[in-house]
Regions:
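Short, surface-exposed, charge-dense and proline/glycine-enriched linear segments
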Residues: 72, 95-109, 147-153, 179-183
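Aromatic- and glycine-enriched beta-alpha-beta binding-site module
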Residues: 78-142
Length: 223
């Protein structure tokens, strides 16, 4: 599938995701309780479901290259407070328990500039007493741009460029308890993609880059 040019503007091949990103942060109300907003709520629901399906299709196509990875459930199109949430994510679990660090695909950005990041992380609500220790072993692996860190400091996620200096800094901050957890991430553009194949090729290259970080979280690397 190729980009379609229309009246001087390009239509993204991920048109459902692009359309739903516009609605980020809106409040969803059950159509039966929405009164005169009923049609708007039905539109929100339709766009949310379509975007989620489009994202899930990409995830499934990617997962076919890695049949040993098991797909966890894709995030919903709204959160528990019924706020529209277009930045979907999907974990891909390898061997081991669901508490283990794993791969995840996560949407990011806005309608004009969006993409999907591949990351090594874990599911917070399923973590155990060893999850954080295993996750932070990603700092044992040498890093280079465009891979980057996302570190949680005082409950806030902060991005750090993938440099040796930042690797050493974050390692020290983890030891002193200033940093709780560190993810490694690699962004892949979707907004300007011209084909699904292009995106999948890029994601496979990204996976190759991140595998050493994932392997560092395994029991084999315990010291």
């Amino acid at each position: 599938m190729l980009e379609i040019e229309k009246k001087g503007a390009y239509m993204s091949i991920f048109s459902a995701i692009e359309a739903y990103l516009v609605l980020q942060g809106n409040k969803y109300i059950s159509p039966d309780k929405a009164g005169e907003l009923r049609e708007m709520m039905l539109d929100f629901k339709q766009k949310g479901q379509a975007a989620r399906a489009e994202f899930l299709d990409l995830v499934k196509q990617f997962q076919r290259f890695y049949p040993k990875l098991t797909l966890e459930r894709t995030s919903n199109w709204m959160n528990q407070a019924q706020i529209l949430r277009p930045h979907f994510w999907n974990y891909l679990r390898g061997c081991g328990d669901v508490t283990e660090p794993m791969f995840a695909l996560r949407l990011y950005g806005n309608p004009k500039d969006f993409g999907v990041s591949l990351e090594v992380s874990f599911i917070e609500r399923k973590k155990d007493e060893t999850s954080l220790t295993k996750q932070n072993r990603v700092l044992q692996v040498p890093i280079a741009v465009p891979v980057y860190y996302l570190a949680q400091i005082n409950g806030v996620s902060q991005r750090f460029t993938g440099t040796e200096e930042n690797r050493k800094y974050l390692s020290q901050q983890v030891k002193t308890g200033q940093v709780r957890k560190v993810l490694v991430k690699y962004d892949v553009d979707l907004a300007q993609a011209t084909s699904i194949r292009q995106v999948l090729d890029k994601l496979q290259a990204t996976m190759t880059t991140l595998i050493p970080f994932y392997e560092a979280t395994r029991e084999l690397y315990e010291v």
